[in-house]
Design a protein with these regions (language model features):
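Negatively charged
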Residues: 123-216
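Basic/hydrophobic alpha-helical interface regions
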Residues: 1-84, 88, 92-131
Length: 216
């Protein structure tokens, strides 16, 4: 095997347990997911083109460092088209909301920061109509309606111990904890001032993207 060859350059991957992954099929399905997301919400179209997709087994599911989206071929090959669209939108939203940069600035513990950031992202996607709780639950994502209209800081402060034992945790806590490819974030909150701050932050992110100032 050519060790310099990228995973996506293989027609078929054979895992140690004998599992075969059709990479041509996977890449085609990923392209369909990108097109579907851009159709559902055109705002994402330009953002999809700005990130590089890296297929790797160093993450358990998918993750982003703000510039790349790291894709585990085995995990992703098992997803339906709807699930692929959700996971793709989820990773891009971490970039839009600058979770990695903001989490580092606040110096919060990584796992707890990831959990708060994931709750914020998934709540936003549900409210935008890109996904729903059933799709998120099927991928093990973290979602709780009580965090709707709340941002990273308040979610973190409200739930500092992380999700309860009843919450879904196959999650992004695992997927963002490998190799520093994590994202933590900022935003608003449940009271009036937090909500105003959150909406202002989201509006500013969109404006920055339109003006070419948003770097992902």
């Amino acid at each position: 095997m050519n060790n310099n060859k990228k995973w996506e350059e293989y027609d078929t991957l054979v895992l140690p347990d004998g599992t075969e992954i059709d990479m041509l099929k996977l890449l085609n399905e990923q392209d369909r997911a990108k097109a579907a997301l851009a159709h559902i919400e055109p705002f994402f179209a330009g953002l999809i083109g700005k990130v590089r997709f890296v297929y790797t087994f160093h993450v358990e599911t998918q993750a982003t460092d703000g510039y790349n989206i790291f894709v585990n071929p085995y995990f992703t090959s098992k997803l339906t088209l709807e699930q692929k669209v959700f996971v793709l939108a989820h990773e891009i939203m971490h970039n839009i909301l600058n979770h990695l940069r903001r989490g580092r600035a606040l110096n919060h513990p990584q796992d707890k920061s990831n959990i708060a950031a994931d709750y914020e992202v998934n709540s936003q996607l549900e409210q935008m109509g890109i996904t729903n709780a059933n799709i998120m639950n099927s991928t093990g994502a973290l979602y709780d309606k009580k965090y709707d209209n709340m941002g990273y800081e308040q979610i973190y402060a409200t739930n500092p111990a992380g999700p309860s034992s009843g919450d879904k945790q196959q999650n992004d806590q695992n997927k963002h904890s490998k190799g520093g490819q994590n994202q933590q974030g900022g935003g608003g909150g449940g009271n009036q001032q937090y909500s105003a701050d959150y909406k202002a932050g989201w509006a500013q992110a969109i404006e920055d993207y339109k003006n070419g100032k948003l770097k992902i």
